[in-house]
Structure formats: C-alpha cells, structure tokens
C-alpha cells in the first residue's frame, strides 16, 4: 500500500502595487468601539454609528498601517498590548441588509499574521465600512476566530 501525503498550502494573493503619487485615495469610513464591534443594526436605513473616523487611503493599505492611523488620533489605544479587531461592514443586496465579516487582528507592540493584510486582500470595496473593536491591554484579547473558506 502506498503512502499518501497531503500538504496544506496557503496561497497569498498578489496585490497590485498602487502608485500613491498618481492614484487618488479613497475615503475609508472607520467606526471604532471599545471591547466589541458595533451591531450591524447600527448601519441600517442610512444610519451609521456616531463615532466616525474618516481616513483617506488606498486599497493597498495594510491593517498595521490602519492601526497606526487610529493610534495617532486616539491616545488611549497607544498602550502596548492593545488589540484591534478589524471587520468589514458591507451591504447584502439580496436581503437589503448589512453584513459584517472579520478580516484580521493586530496588536500594538507585537507582530501578527494579519499585520500585512491589505484592504484589497480582504476584498474591501469602495462604499464598505470598517468596524474596529479595540480591546485595551488590561482586558482579554479577541477570541480566536474560526477559519472561514473565503
């Protein structure tokens, strides 16, 4: 009987390099909350949560880069060990509702596997929102997410 081997290969999608000098940035609407994500119902019927942060950036922006931008405007998040759990809030046109999909976690002062993930790799589309759950270092970090097939 022959031995059977299997290998799990994680393929990284190639991100097309954007010339930030020649390409106009997009408006990224970011909503931060401490300890949890906003409820999807807060994005319904043209409403959004009140604590909006507007960032002009490009599709090749990494989660680490976005973490740095949020830390620049929010001094409470600069402490080492602060977790940033990113999620994309996007419209589901079939059901006329919004849905939320977690895309990665970063931590201040620590390197992580999601640090170099870009908005393009997370399948972010212009018009989507970015919802960030910020967990201070004195609380437990976000629980491990189950692996999703997308």
UniProtKB/Swiss-Prot annotation:
It is found in: Nucleus; Cytoplasm. One of its GO terms (biological process) is heterochromatin formation. Gene3D superfamilies: ASAP complex, SAP18 subunit. It comes from the Eukaryota. One of its GO terms (molecular function) is transcription corepressor activity. Pfam families: SAP18. One of its GO terms (cellular component) is cytoplasm. Keywords: Cytoplasm, Developmental protein, Nucleus, Repressor, Transcription, Transcription regulation. InterPro entries: Hist_deAcase_cplx_SAP18, SAP18, SAP18_sf. Belongs to the SAP18 family. Involved in the tethering of the SIN3 complex to core histone proteins. Interacts with bicoid (bcd) to repress transcription of bicoid target genes in the anterior tip of the embryo; a process known as retraction. Interacts with Trl and binds to Polycomb response elements at the bithorax complex. May contribute to the regulation of other homeotic gene expressions. Forms a complex with SIN3 and histone deacetylase. Interacts with the N-terminal residues of TRL. Interacts with BCD; in vitro and yeast cells. This is Histone deacetylase complex subunit SAP18. The gene is Bin1.
């Amino acid at each position: 009987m022959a031995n059977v081997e299997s290998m799990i290969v994680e393929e990284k999608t190639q991100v097309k390099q954007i010339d930030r000098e020649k390409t106009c940035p997009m408006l990224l609407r970011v909503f931060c909350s401490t300890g949890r994500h906003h409820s999807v119902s807060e994005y319904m019927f043209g409403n959004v949560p009140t604590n909006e942060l507007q960032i002009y950036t490009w599709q090749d922006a990494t989660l680490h880069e976005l973490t740095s931008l949020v830390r620049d405007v929010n001094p409470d998040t600069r402490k080492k060990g602060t977790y940033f759990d990113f999620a994309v809030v996007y419209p589901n046109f079939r059901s006329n509702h919004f849905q939320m999909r977690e895309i990665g976690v970063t931590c201040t002062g620590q390197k992580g596997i999601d640090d170099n993930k870009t908005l393009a790799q997370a399948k972010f589309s212009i018009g989507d929102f970015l919802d960030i759950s910020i967990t201070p270092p004195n609380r437990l970090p976000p629980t491990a997410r189950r692996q999703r097939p997308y």
